Swiss-Prot record:
This is Phosphoribosylaminoimidazole-succinocarboxamide synthase. Disulfide bonds: none annotated. Gene3D superfamilies: ATP-grasp fold, B domain, Phosphorylase Kinase, domain 1. Pfam families: SAICAR_synt. It is an enzyme of class 6 (ligase). NCBIfam families: purC. GO terms for biological process: 'de novo' IMP biosynthetic process; cobalamin biosynthetic process. The keyword Metal-binding does not apply. It catalyses: 5-amino-1-(5-phospho-D-ribosyl)imidazole-4-carboxylate + L-aspartate + ATP = (2S)-2-[5-amino-1-(5-phospho-beta-D-ribosyl)imidazole-4-carboxamido]succinate + ADP + phosphate + 2 H(+). Belongs to the SAICAR synthetase family. Its EC number is 6.3.2.6. CDD domains: SAICAR_synt_PurC. It comes from Pseudomonas putida (strain W619). Keywords: ATP-binding, Ligase, Nucleotide-binding, Purine biosynthesis.
């Protein structure tokens, strides 16, 4: 597989074309950002950890019947993925109250949500990824009602699979965001799943083991990511 020119540079990943029109290469960088890219720092080993963490999770999801863009690891910081036509919407599943939900509703952090909640946000850094609903997605042409239904179904399936995986590792899956795209007419899970895009707390101590350590200045960010990977059995 030949790596060609950079197609897109995000806050923490770069996307490259290949000699296959249906495949891309994702490069996981050490860049770590918060507050919609207003704060960016370099954290050693982060690209490697997130690349291998993502590969592990995507393979677990594929085994459970969730279609993903992931094909294979290419190295410590790179993987080969399917080229998706991305839907510009973030799907957020919450099992415990945290983050923007706490700020928006004024509820206490850590409350268990039963049932888990499903939310939609428009991917738009300039607007701060605004909270939207299903009617907005269809009315503005960001996706169809059928695509939304499949995205919700797959998001809840991911939650079911990963809740057990993390629980067995002594971790609470507090919340997470997913992005989806279309590949040959099928809705497929895209982007990545890593501690950058989810909240994970130690089940006993409620210690934060995710990017909130960076956002809140708690320190030991990569050490926490590596601890989560170790508990799951991710080969680093």
């Amino acid at each position: 597989m030949e790596k060609r020119e950079e197609l897109y540079r995000g806050k923490a990943k770069s996307v490259y074309k290949t000699d296959d029109a249906d495949r891309l290469i994702l490069l996981f960088r050490n860049d770590t950002s918060a507050f919609d890219g207003k704060r960016i720092e370099q954290l050693d080993r982060k690209g490697m950890v997130n690349n291998k963490f993502n590969a592990f999770i995507m393979q677990k999801l594929e085994e459970a019947g969730v279609p993903t863009q992931f094909d294979k690891l290419l190295g410590d910081n790179e993987c080969l993925v399917k080229k998706l036509d991305m839907i510009p919407v973030e799907c957020v599943v919450r099992n415990y109250a945290a983050g923007s939900l706490v700020k928006r509703l004024g509820v206490e952090e850590g409350i268990k949500l039963e049932p888990s909640t499903f939310e939609l946000f428009l991917k738009n850094d300039e607007k701060g990824d605004p909270f939207i609903n299903e009617s907005h997605v269809v009315a503005f042409g960001w996706g169809t009602a059928e695509q939304l239904a499949e995205m919700k179904k797959l998001s809840l399936k991911v939650n079911e699979v990963l809740n057990k995986l993390f629980d067995d590792a002594g971790l609470l899956l507090v919340d997470f965001k997913l992005e989806f795209g279309v590949f040959h007419g099928q809705i497929v899970l895209g982007d990545e799943f890593s501690p950058d895009g989810c909240r994970l707390w130690d089940k006993e101590t409620r210690k934060k083991m995710d990017k909130d350590r960076f956002r809140q200045g708690l320190g030991d960010v990569i050490e926490a990511y590596e601890e989560v990977a170790k508990r799951l059995g991710v080969p680093l």
